[in-house]
Amino acid sequence: MIQQESYLNVADNSGAKKLLCIRVLGGGNRRYGSVGDVIIATVKDATPNMPVKKSDVVRAVIVRTRKAIRRESGMSIRFDDNAAVLINQDGNPKGTRVFGPVARELRDKNFTKIVSLAPEVL
């Protein structure tokens, strides 16, 4: 469950390390975001000499949350951290690699490129 002012780790090699959520997209006054939701965030920590710099405003899709995700089968899944992958306006990832597991819900929300780059899909 990600809201305004939430910090997230970055799960790709775009150059950003930490994000601060500015806005959860979708709906007029949407308060919380979960796995598969697109957010607007600012980069709080970045690797030097990379395309993404500190204080850049970026779009990202949430790939892991500490809040448990309830599935229709009755199973729930949760992760150790809150993490996101940076995307461009078309929804394609900015990085070429994705680190750590991602949730299967991303496939349902048409982020198949991120799912294919991930080492593990839970």
From Swiss-Prot:
PROSITE patterns: RIBOSOMAL_L14. SUPFAM superfamilies: Ribosomal protein L14. It comes from the Bacteria. InterPro entries: Ribosomal_uL14 (IPR000218), Ribosomal_uL14_bac-type (IPR005745), Ribosomal_uL14_CS (IPR019972), Ribosomal_uL14_sf (IPR036853). GO terms for cellular component: cytosolic large ribosomal subunit. Keywords: Ribonucleoprotein, Ribosomal protein, RNA-binding, rRNA-binding. GO terms for biological process: translation. GO terms for molecular function: large ribosomal subunit rRNA binding; structural constituent of ribosome. PANTHER family: 50S/60S RIBOSOMAL PROTEIN L14/L23, LARGE RIBOSOMAL SUBUNIT PROTEIN UL14M. Part of the 50S ribosomal subunit. Forms a cluster with proteins L3 and L19. In the 70S ribosome, L14 and L19 interact and together make contacts with the 16S rRNA in bridges B5 and B8. Belongs to the universal ribosomal protein uL14 family. Binds to 23S rRNA. Forms part of two intersubunit bridges in the 70S ribosome. This is Large ribosomal subunit protein uL14. It comes from Cyanothece sp. (strain PCC 7425 / ATCC 29141). The lineage of its organism: Bacteria, Bacillati, Cyanobacteriota, Cyanophyceae, Gomontiellales. The gene is rplN.
